[in-house]
Amino acid sequence: KCKCVCEGFAKAFKFLCDKIDLECWVVSGKGSSSIGAGPHAWNIVKINGYYHHVDVTWDNQYSDSSSMPNYGYMNLSDDEIAKDHTWNKKHYPECPSSPYNYFRVNNALLDSKAQLESMLYNSLQMEEEFITFRVVRGSILEREINGCLTDCIQKAANRCKYISVPTFRYGGVPEQLTFFVQPDYCYR
């Protein structure tokens, strides 16, 4: 039936990393989120000398459709993943920073409404099927995001010359301050 739980995801990810000689650990710990809490397994990978946490299970379960990508748990630091994961740190490499975090690498780590509107506008102009971003913890945008996301999407869409976005879906992973937008495009 090809089904597994978190340990299977983590071991499969390690298997793939081993095939390309990417140092990878399977981490055993606990996870706690709005979905539930309990024993959990995920990975630590070493990329260009930096260790990062990767949780392919939670990136998969937070995606509400098989085609909706989620990168909320891709290449996190200890502090970032500790928002909803716990583990015995003495058994694993330290992950003090996350230079290869998906959102950092893709310039989708935002701390202001102006940055959000600009990123949304550029993404809509390019007719991206999915738009993903992370809000910087402690930023003004963190306090405003729940009240302004719909408005920012609509403002960005209204600036587009040749397309309109009459409907869209959005959601995210609140613990990791990651969000996605899936626009439905129409042409003017």
Specify the residue positions occupied by each region the protein language model found.
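Hydrophobic/aromatic-rich core segments of domains that either
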Residues: 7-79
